[in-house]
């Protein structure tokens, strides 16, 4: 059981003992494990960067491949927001599985 509401936690603990739970989602891309949501651990593993400024610079570099082009599909929209590496490794497969379509066939507004 998981809640951040102390009143609810106190209430349910009247009836049973619960273990502490920490939600730590990860993504598995070709056997490589990445933290989700994205954080400095994710960026360090992707690019070896150690500061937020370095991570931001890498993302900006990758975002710029589209130039001033207006995104025409979900893939282009995602790349324009988070760059190619994060999109390819952590977003594309999940999105295509969820929607049952290639990201290039999905509208940019999703």
Predicted regions and their residues:
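A conserved beta-strand/loop capping segment in the N-terminal third of enzymes
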Residues: 1-55
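Active-site/ligand-binding neighborhood in enzyme catalytic cores
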Residues: 32-34, 41-110
